Amino acid sequence: MAQHFDICIRGAGIVGRALALLLARERLRVALVAAPQTASKTQDVRAYALNGASKQLLDSLRAWPDAQHATPIQRMHVVGDGNSHVQFDAQAQGAEALTWIVDVPALEQRLADAVRYQPLIEVVDAPVAAPLTAICEGRASSTRAELGAEF
């Protein structure tokens, strides 16, 4: 018997996985199209600066990395040309942090683990039929190229 999916998400990066988890939380059946993983010869040292809303969303998905992989930024001093400058302070704004610097591999792993344990998400190799398709492939999107949609 063929599987029925409510949505097909093309792209299993951070955005695609987070969207899949959010939709599954709403009881939707999700097909998540993931490209085959290739082993990298170099260590992934990428990091994202994520705001409080992103942290709150990832916390709600139980996908926020541990403290070793998410560093809060408490203060920031920006110096411009000449004598211009501006300072920001999380405590003065009543915020936990101005932003967090998050290791990309740790965040990707937390989201992948959450997807693996979500029964309403099925990771597939190729797009499947669904009433709705979300394109979360990033800049080099093969789907947009198929559709002739420039970015």
Name each model-derived stretch.
Residues 29, 64, 122:
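Residue-level detector of anion-binding/catalytic polar loops
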Residues 2, 71-147:
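Conserved N-terminal helical subregion
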Residues 2-15, 31:
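Beta1/beta-strand and adjacent pyrophosphate-binding region of the FAD-binding site
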